[in-house]
Amino acid sequence: MMKRLLAAGSICVFLFLGVIGCGGESMAGYQKIPAAEAKNMMDKGGVTVVDVRREEEYKTGHISEAVLLTNETIGNKPPALLPDKNAVILVYCRSGVRSRQASEKLIKLGYKKVFDMGGIKDWPYDVVT
């Protein structure tokens, strides 16, 4: 009898830990992706590309169709440029620091599909001015 109770208890603990572990995987968070993956996503369409550099930097060259939303302007309210919190958002800056910061802010604001593509300095594809 004691062995059965111990076995049943062990199974319950195992199942409980399994459920908790799976729940952690689905927590919201941004994902860091390489330039090639970001380019592939953009080629397929249905994404919003966000440049979080300053306006002067944006004007010197940016990824085609990227919208300018400076990191400093992302605050406590969802940006008007990003009305859909379920949209796929690709974020970049110059070196990757501000894109990480902006991605974290967007996740905290409730955006679900945020991808940090790092810095434009590592972008091997065309840019526009």
Map each language-model feature to its residues:
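Structural scaffold elements adjacent to functional motifs in cytosolic proteins
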Residues: 49-51
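Rhodanese-like catalytic fold shared by cysteine-dependent sulfurtransferases
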Residues: 3-10, 14-47, 56-88, 94-129
